[in-house]
Regions:
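N-terminal secretory signal peptides that target proteins for export/translocation
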Residues: 1-10
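Sec-dependent signal peptide recognition
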Residues: 12-20
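Active-site-adjacent loops and short helices of periplasmic peptidoglycan-processing enzymes
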Residues: 31-201
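Domain-terminus/edge residues, biased toward the C-terminal soluble/receptor-binding domains
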Residues: 159-160, 175-347
Length: 347
């Protein structure tokens, strides 16, 4: 080998060695940084929450219990109530009140008829305010009755400081209350929608669609909707979400991500005003990346409830007439990667 070739080979080896050293010393630092929760000042949102979607445990909270307006993120509750309480092929007619709903709206005149399924898609993908009103009236008769239904649902879900007045999230006041929730409650509602509701699969399908086309009942008028939840294309595993904005609420967002057996939910309130439309995406990414880096899921072996065999129990008509097997529970733990905090829950 010539001296020149030896020199080139030596240079390549030296460069490779330097690159390896850089990776060796900087990667752990970056990993440790990712495992640290964001400083409150690093997030644009006034209120922000990261939740373990599996257990409902709050992993990170910035002003998570503060009552704030939440704009169109309200529609996730309107959606799940409609899915649970009506036939999607049911026909609904646009009322005079619904036709007056402000933009963003479908713009259908009073008297026009649609299938409930199509109205739900239009509400969740395009965030049409008039569609939310039609849905509320179809489910409960009036928006006032639907408001009561929403608040009853919120209480059953476990919300602690939520009071909804409008089905679309438009700012409103009633008596001494204003339309509001908290970031923690909003995450709880999303968890119900994607994990606990008997219609969770339908909710995920609707909110995960990129676009949707439909017509009114007459077939004369066609509509095409696009999903404005940009987060669905931002991170692998993003499965659902809803944006929101009003002058009082600012930009709001609630979204969910599933990856490696873990589900994370982010809820953001008052995350900037025009021209800060992208702040919510920045905050969502930071919180999701923190969750993915700092926490992991560990499956545990099946264990007997008390570690011993239960006494045989006679069962009428059972084969052999008795049951004497152990009762097992499947457990898994969502724990921080430094093993400092463990959460066990039934799987």
């Amino acid at each position: 080998m010539s001296e020149e070739k030896k020199w080139v080979l030596g240079l390549k080896r030296a460069i490779s060695f330097i690159i390896c050293l850089i990776i060796l010393f900087t990667y752990p630092t970056k990993l440790m940084a990712a495992q640290e929760p964001p400083e409150e000042a690093e997030l644009f949102a006034k209120a922000a929450v990261l939740m373990d979607g599996g257990s409902g445990r709050i992993l990170y909270s910035k002003n998570g219990s503060e009552a704030l307006a939440n704009a169109s993120t309200t529609k996730i509750l309107t959606c799940i109530i409609a899915l649970e309480n009506c036939d999607l092929e049911q026909i609904a007619e646009v009322s005079v009140q619904a036709a007056k709903a402000p933009k963003v709206h479908l713009g259908a005149p009073a008297g026009q008829k649609f299938r409930m399924k199509d109205l739900i898609y239009a509400m969740m993908l395009e965030s049409f305010n008039d569609c939310a009103v039609v849905i509320a009236e179809q489910v409960a008769g009036t928006t006032e009755h639907f408001s009561k239904l929403m608040n009853d649902y919120a209480k059953k879900i476990g919300c602690k400081d939520t009071f909804f007045i409008t089905p679309n999230g438009l700012d409103a006041q009633k008596d001494s209350q204003f339309h509001h929730t908290t970031a923690e409650d909003l995450a709880r509602i999303m968890r119900y929608c994607i994990k606990e509701s008997p219609k969770a699969d339908q909710f995920l399908k609707i909110t995960g669609e990129a676009e949707y086309t439909f017509t009114d009942v007459s077939g004369k008028y066609a509509y095409h909707c696009y999903n404005h939840n940009a987060f669905l294309k931002m991170m692998d595993g993003a499965v659902s979400g809803k944006t929101g904005f009003t002058g009082n609420a600012g930009y709001c967002y609630v979204g969910a991500l599933e990856q490696n057996g873990k589900t994370y939910i982010v809820a953001l309130l008052a995350c900037g005003w025009p021209n800060n439309r992208t702040y919510k995406w920045s905050d969502t990414r930071k919180l999701m990346e923190y969750g993915l880096a700092a926490y992991e899921r560990c499956d545990l072996d099946d264990i007997a409830l008390d570690g011993s065999r239960f006494a045989p129990v006679p069962v009428e008509h059972a084969q052999g007439g008795r049951i004497g097997e152990q009762v097992y529970m499947k457990l898994h733990a969502v724990l921080k990667k430094d093993l400092s905090h463990v959460l066990l829950r039934e799987g």
